[in-house]
Design a protein with these regions (language model features):
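N- or domain-start disorder-to-order transition segments that initiate the globular core
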Residues: 1-42
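Active-site-facing alpha/beta catalytic cores
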Residues: 2, 68, 81-246, 267-272, ...
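Glycine-rich phosphate/diphosphate-binding loops that line cofactor/substrate pockets in enzymes
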Residues: 39-47, 253-258
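Conserved phosphate/anionic-ligand binding catalytic regions in large, soluble enzymes, centered on
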Residues: 50-63, 325
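Conserved, mostly hydrophobic/aromatic
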Residues: 54, 263, 329
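Short acidic, Gly/Ser-rich segments with clustered Asp/Glu that frequently serve as metal-coordination loops
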Residues: 56-59, 258, 266-272
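Internal helix-turn-beta structural module
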Residues: 306-344
Length: 344
């Protein structure tokens, strides 16, 4: 059988795209300040709650900028209690490889795949978010090769449930230079997540993009609990008090820096019932109030939110409505943010 792979075109190097779409000096300083604030939260120097919130998929630059502009206003209202990082996710993992895979693949969700244009579109959008709202953002590190196109713009990274066992993802996380959350796998096996955190915190040597690479380890690699699927295909949560205590105990069995948990309030924790995110977020806050140990280790929440409630199919054309997983609409999101600030 012949190799079933066609090399379509050579893509530009990350440094070339960074030079074409640069981040200007004042915003590089802003990113450094935001990076330090998040590091202080993860290391316990700052007792604010990290809130990573935004669309399931950042599919449309005008709507994403609109959302982040609204978010910036409420972020200023709660800045003493919450540190907000927009999730601007431009890659979408697909279980069977079909469907919309994010702006990286399709700058126009209704158009053809064009990764040459996609690379530039996602960088341009992240730069515009920083310049227009003052936010540096979170992204999923779905493709290790893609990270360096955005690495000078991002303040938080996540390794997804399907990628967390992959050696290259763990090694990239070990050199990312920002906090990287390692999600529990879809099976719910917490040992996989903990192994991934340990690998990311260690020094690593590996081959990448034609280079021999050495990393010094990422002391801010940490756990993200996102629920799981049992043997019957049913969504099972892992955000409850006993789940948080279990991860605290697992950290205690290892020599890891900066024990931390971020709870993903959607995905299998909510069974993808987006309205459940409100209840789940409050439940986690109650666990933090009940136990000082839980309060110390639960550093943040992750919420899927956009301008309009729910989701739509590609082509329906509702502005600010998710074309992937259902999200909380803006009014509910704003009310939740204000309530969470009162609960910190």
């Amino acid at each position: 059988m012949k190799e079933q792979m066609k090399f379509v075109r050579k893509l530009p190097e990350p440094i070339e795209v960074q030079q074409e779409i640069p981040l200007r000096a004042p915003y590089r300083k802003l990113k450094a300040e935001r990076d330090q604030a998040i590091e202080d939260i993860m290391t316990g120097k700052d007792d604010r709650l990290l809130l990573i919130i935004g669309p399931c998929s950042a599919d449309n630059e005008p709507a994403v900028l609109d959302y982040c502009t609204r978010l910036a206003k409420v972020a200023d209202e709660v800045k003493d209690k919450l540190f907000i990082v927009p999730r601007v996710y431009t890659n979408k993992p697909r279980t069977i490889g079909k469907g919309y895979k994010g702006m990286l693949h399709q700058p126009d969700p209704e158009g053809n795949e064009n990764m040459m244009e996609g690379i530039k579109a996602i960088r341009r959008m992240h730069v515009h978010v920083i310049e227009e709202t003052g936010f540096t953002c979170a992204e999923e590190i779905l493709y290790p090769e893609n990270h360096r196109y955005l690495s000078d713009l991002l303040s938080y990274g996540a390794i997804g449930a399907r990628s967390v066992e992959d050696q290259l993802h763990r090694m990239i996380a070990s050199g990312a230079g920002i906090p990287v959350g390692m999600k529990n796998p879809t099976s719910g096996d917490l040992s996989v997540m903990m192994n991934s955190i340990e690998a990311a915190q260690n020094e690593q040597d590996f081959l990448f993009h034609g280079w021999e690479v050495h990393t010094t380890g990422n002391s801010l690699a940490h756990a993200i609990l996102r629920g799981y699927v049992n043997h019957f295909g049913t969504s099972m949560p892992n955000y409850h008090y006993e789940n948080l205590k279990k991860v605290l105990d697992l950290y205690g069995e290892r020599t890891l820096a900066n024990p931390a948990i971020v709870v993903d309030c959607n995905h299998n924790n909510s069974g993808k019932k987006y309205m459940e995110q409100i209840r789940i977020a409050k439940d986690v806050m109650a666990s933090r109030r009940y136990s000082s140990d839980v309060a110390r280790i639960v550093k943040g929440l992750m919420i899927e939110s956009y301008i309009e409630d729910g989701s739509q199919k590609i082509g329906e054309g509702v502005y600010g409505k998710s074309i992937t997983d259902p999200c909380l609409g803006w009014e509910k999101s704003r009310a939740l943010i204000l309530e969470l600030a009162e609960l910190v």
